[in-house]
Amino acid sequence: MDALTDRQLEVLRFIARQIEDNGYPPTIREIGEALDIRSTNGVNDHLKALERKGFLTRDPVKSRALIPTPQAREVLGGGARASNVVPFTRTPAVGLKPAGRLVEIPILGRVAAGQPILAQERVEDTVQVDSFLLGTNKKVYGLRVQGDSMIGDGILPGDYIFVKKQLHAEDGDIVVAMIDEEATVKRVYFEGDRVRFQPSNPRMAPIYVRGSDFRTTMILGVVVGVYRKLG
């Protein structure tokens, strides 16, 4: 694999840092402004070089579809988890507001525990949770569950799941994933050149995504808790 120039490494680091901080990649214009690259053509030249050298994948139709490859993660210090990473793009996230020992979790629409449906990214409500249960992580948000594919894990229709935004998941984690632009809740398993999204309802079949389709699949976060209203 060809070595990176200092400038290419700088661009790659900026992309990775923006994904880590914001949950989605920067635009070409944002890269240029941050790194003082005067033209979008100049930024594109660096992106093409990173792609050609195997450090970046991107979708030319989508301005934010810039995904560091496993090789890039090794260069940037994330090689230990590289094989377990599904490409990640934008995910809803609203900062938590501490209120004594309570934090407010924003509820950002709905997600399917059944057939994938599009999650609506708007704040519908907030719930207050003791920080002892979820900590004070500012990258936690809530989604309202529809469907019954995760009833074996105690996630029922109408429940609210708490989701920690992050770039990776481990085998067996319950995740919110975007598959072909629709969101769903499933357990994730990495199986060689494919990823299996497994429901816990035995009446429902898993969803398989092969490596060639990773571009249209992304992890939006890992489920860290469930909230249920009674009465």
UniProtKB/Swiss-Prot annotation:
<dbReference type="GO" id="GO:0009432">
    <property type="term" value="P:SOS response"/>
</dbReference>
<keyword id="KW-0234">DNA repair</keyword>
<dbReference type="GO" id="GO:0004252">
    <property type="term" value="F:serine-type endopeptidase activity"/>
</dbReference>
<keyword id="KW-0378">Hydrolase</keyword>
<keyword id="KW-0068">Autocatalytic cleavage</keyword>
<keyword id="KW-0238">DNA-binding</keyword>
<dbReference type="GO" id="GO:0003677">
    <property type="term" value="F:DNA binding"/>
</dbReference>
<dbReference type="InterPro" id="IPR006197">
    <property type="entry name" value="Peptidase_S24_LexA"/>
</dbReference>
<dbReference type="GO" id="GO:0045892">
    <property type="term" value="P:negative regulation of DNA-templated transcription"/>
</dbReference>
<feature type="site" description="Cleavage; by autolysis">
    <location>
        <begin position="113"/>
        <end position="114"/>
    </location>
</feature>
<dbReference type="InterPro" id="IPR006200">
    <property type="entry name" value="LexA"/>
</dbReference>
<comment type="subunit">
    <text>Homodimer.</text>
</comment>
<dbReference type="GO" id="GO:0006508">
    <property type="term" value="P:proteolysis"/>
</dbReference>
<dbReference type="InterPro" id="IPR050077">
    <property type="entry name" value="LexA_repressor"/>
</dbReference>
<dbReference type="InterPro" id="IPR006199">
    <property type="entry name" value="LexA_DNA-bd_dom"/>
</dbReference>
<dbReference type="InterPro" id="IPR036286">
    <property type="entry name" value="LexA/Signal_pep-like_sf"/>
</dbReference>
<dbReference type="InterPro" id="IPR036390">
    <property type="entry name" value="WH_DNA-bd_sf"/>
</dbReference>
<dbReference type="InterPro" id="IPR015927">
    <property type="entry name" value="Peptidase_S24_S26A/B/C"/>
</dbReference>
<dbReference type="GO" id="GO:0006281">
    <property type="term" value="P:DNA repair"/>
</dbReference>
<keyword id="KW-0227">DNA damage</keyword>
<dbReference type="InterPro" id="IPR036388">
    <property type="entry name" value="WH-like_DNA-bd_sf"/>
</dbReference>
<protein>
    <recommendedName>
        <fullName>LexA repressor</fullName>
        <ecNumber>3.4.21.88</ecNumber>
    </recommendedName>
</protein>
<comment type="similarity">
    <text>Belongs to the peptidase S24 family.</text>
</comment>
<comment type="function">
    <text>Represses a number of genes involved in the response to DNA damage (SOS response), including recA and lexA. In the presence of single-stranded DNA, RecA interacts with LexA causing an autocatalytic cleavage which disrupts the DNA-binding part of LexA, leading to derepression of the SOS regulon and eventually DNA repair.</text>
</comment>
<keyword id="KW-0742">SOS response</keyword>
<dbReference type="Pfam" id="PF01726">
    <property type="entry name" value="LexA_DNA_bind"/>
</dbReference>
<dbReference type="Pfam" id="PF00717">
    <property type="entry name" value="Peptidase_S24"/>
</dbReference>
<feature type="active site" description="For autocatalytic cleavage activity">
    <location>
        <position position="186"/>
    </location>
</feature>
<keyword id="KW-0805">Transcription regulation</keyword>
<feature type="DNA-binding region" description="H-T-H motif">
    <location>
        <begin position="28"/>
        <end position="48"/>
    </location>
</feature>
<feature type="active site" description="For autocatalytic cleavage activity">
    <location>
        <position position="149"/>
    </location>
</feature>
<dbReference type="GO" id="GO:0006260">
    <property type="term" value="P:DNA replication"/>
</dbReference>
<keyword id="KW-0678">Repressor</keyword>
<dbReference type="InterPro" id="IPR039418">
    <property type="entry name" value="LexA-like"/>
</dbReference>
<keyword id="KW-0235">DNA replication</keyword>
<keyword id="KW-0804">Transcription</keyword>
